Amino acid sequence: MKITWLGTAAIRLEADGETVLFDPFVQLVGGENPNCLDDFLQDQTICVTHGHLDHLMEVPEFLDPESDAEATVYCGEVAAETLSDMVENTSNVVKVRPGDVIRLGDVRILVMEGKHAKPGKSQVFQKLFSRRFLQYFR
């Protein structure tokens, strides 16, 4: 099994001849992620962990029937609703719930419930006024 971190939340898992991309996201201009969208488009199986844009913003590119990418996207209900607002055709979007098992050849992915951090006011203020965040607005 090979796991490759691709920046932000993006991870590529390779095992038993299968490749799965989790949370594809291309860094905003000026960011530290050296990847571009073309680095992701060869992947045909996408898993989105939750519906925030930094986890699914690039996913519509994989669902574009005019691109060569046309992947199958596994995601929860909220992410699926977000994607349905972003693209016309969601026939390749598969809704999953905690406890579901995604089977890809000999690879099994168990869908688990996750808890997203809920920052308080001080953490939000620190993030919004951090040098790393403000660089995007130069």
Task: Map each language-model feature to its residues.
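Short hydrophobic/aromatic beta-strand or adjacent loop that forms the aromatic wall/cage
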Residues: 8-10, 99
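Metallo-beta-lactamase
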Residues: 76-138
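Metal-dependent catalytic neighborhoods of phosphoester/phosphodiester hydrolases
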Residues: 57-68, 78-79, 84-88
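Short gly/ser/thr-rich secondary-structure transition/capping motifs
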Residues: 2-5, 26-32, 91-94
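Pre-active-site segment of Zn-dependent metallo-hydrolases
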Residues: 12-52, 57-65, 118-138
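Short active-site oxyanion
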Residues: 1-2, 45, 66-72
